């Protein structure tokens, strides 16, 4: 038997293996993944429960992957066996890699969704509120599309005062992504200017998933997320759910539905305004009545504090003081009378006491006179006889009397006395 060198046997093995396993499909779990930053080549192992085989994915093929290769993924690789003669190693030179059970596009989309979710692209807290009464709306669509025609028709019926501006955009095929991104940036550039748009609507009618798949692109997602203007995604039909729907501030199932969601119904608002007017009139009448009652209350309060009222209160106080003085005067006279009655006749013979008695009598008459003046009515006069105040009931016909008040004095004679 011919003896072979190591190099010779490895060369023969290489020729045999590479010819026999020129194209193979192998399924297994990705492990030991290494991606070289400089070369861009990916090196990994594919394993099952019993064996492991090394694999290589060169940069050109790696760039065609629509998803990110990660440890632990169950993959089906398509390629050929290659042998490295110097070490006698063999590996699978991968041409294509597909996820097991799902397509590469689906996996790529799921990975992109997870990436954007972690960046907060889907968070409700980061979404802008829908404008209540839009005046100017940018519609990113094809100006010759049925979607644009439907949107204009619905807008004119619902809210004709809103200005719709079509930004003509390529909505499918090569160049679609870049065209949409540029249109979003253009519409958003008017933000905070007098020509600012209240909303940006990215709209396209239905089509195949291939036609709509551009709206799953990360660049469009970035443009929508970074826009400072409220955005809506209205792509395809109700059953179509794309990445742009998740990132935009609001999703509409169709372009027509976008107008129904975004624009208020003018007929409904006219009815509501009528209702508001009725409520406003009713509230105004109620408020007016309340204010009238309040003013009447204030007027009554002011009247109580008026000059006339104060004068009346002072008159009442004066009357009370007069009565109090009268009572004190009468009490004083009674005390003095009692004291005089207790003084004996013998004591009164004393010149000193007689003088005091006369003085006391004068004081008594003065007090009676003062007492009479206190009770004197507004148009009355004091009645006196022999310079002493007397009551009418003690007078008799023929008595000479004097009538006096603060302003005058008069003499009179009693003609008759009628006792009541």
Curated annotation (Swiss-Prot):
Major subcellular site: cytoplasm
EC numbers on record: 3.1.11.6
Keywords from the named record: Cytoplasm, Exonuclease, Hydrolase, Nuclease
Keyword Transit peptide: no
One GO CC annotation: exodeoxyribonuclease VII complex
A GO molecular-function descriptor: nucleic acid binding
Function in brief: Bidirectionally degrades single-stranded DNA into large acid-insoluble oligonucleotides, which are then degraded further into small acid-soluble oligonucleotides.
Subunit and partners: Heterooligomer composed of large and small subunits.
Family membership noted in the UniProt record: Belongs to the XseA family.
HAMAP family reported for this sequence: Exonuc_7_L
Name of this protein: Exodeoxyribonuclease 7 large subunit
Organism: Helicobacter pylori (strain G27)
């Amino acid at each position: 038997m011919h003896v072979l060198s190591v190099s010779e046997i490895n060369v023969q093995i290489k020729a045999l293996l590479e010819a026999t396993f020129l194209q193979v499909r192998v399924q297994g779990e990705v492990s030991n993944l290494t991606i070289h930053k400089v070369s861009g080549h990916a090196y990994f192992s594919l394993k099952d429960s019993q064996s492991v085989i090394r694999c290589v994915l060169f940069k050109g093929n790696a760039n065609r992957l629509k998803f990110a290769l990660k440890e632990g993924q169950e993959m089906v690789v398509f390629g050929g066996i290659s042998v490295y003669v110097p070490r006698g190693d063999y590996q699978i030179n991968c041409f294509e890699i597909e996820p097991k059970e799902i397509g590469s596009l689906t996996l790529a989309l799921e990975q992109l969704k997870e990436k954007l979710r972690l960046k907060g692209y889907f968070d409700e807290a980061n979404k802008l509120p829908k404008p209540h009464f839009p005046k100017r709306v940018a519609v990113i669509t094809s100006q010759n599309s049925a979607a644009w025609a439907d949107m204009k028709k619905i807008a004119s019926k619902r809210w004709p005062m809103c200005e719709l501006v079509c930004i003509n955009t390529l909505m499918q095929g090569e160049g679609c992504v870049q065209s949409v991104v540029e249109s979003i940036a253009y519409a958003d550039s008017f933000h905070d200017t007098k020509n600012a748009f209240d909303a940006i609507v990215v709209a396209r009618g239905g089509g195949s998933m291939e036609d709509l798949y551009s709206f799953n692109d990360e660049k469009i997602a970035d443009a929508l997320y970074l826009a400072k203007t409220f955005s809506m995604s209205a792509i395809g039909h109700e059953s179509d759910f794309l990445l742009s729907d998740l990132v935009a501030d609001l999703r509409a199932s169709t372009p027509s539905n976008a107008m129904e969601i975004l624009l208020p119904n003018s007929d409904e608002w006219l009815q509501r305004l009528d209702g508001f007017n009725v409520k406003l009139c009713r509230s105004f009448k109620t408020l007016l009545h309340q204010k009238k009652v309040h003013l009447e209350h204030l007027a009554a309060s002011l009247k109580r504090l008026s000059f006339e009222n104060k004068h009346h209160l002072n008159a009442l106080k004066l009357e009370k003081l007069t009565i109090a003085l009268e009572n004190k005067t009468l009490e004083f006279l009674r005390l003095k009378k009692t004291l005089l009655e207790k003084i004996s006749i013998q004591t009164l013979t004393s010149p000193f006491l007689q003088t005091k008695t006369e003085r006391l009598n004068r004081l008594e008459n003065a007090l009676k006179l003062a007492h009479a003046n206190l009770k004197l009515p507004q148009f009355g006069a004091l009645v006196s006889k022999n310079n002493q105040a007397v009551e009418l009931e003690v007078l008799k016909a023929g008595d000479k009397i004097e009538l006096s008040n603060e302003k005058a004095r008069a003499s009179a004679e009693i003609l008759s006395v009628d006792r009541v």
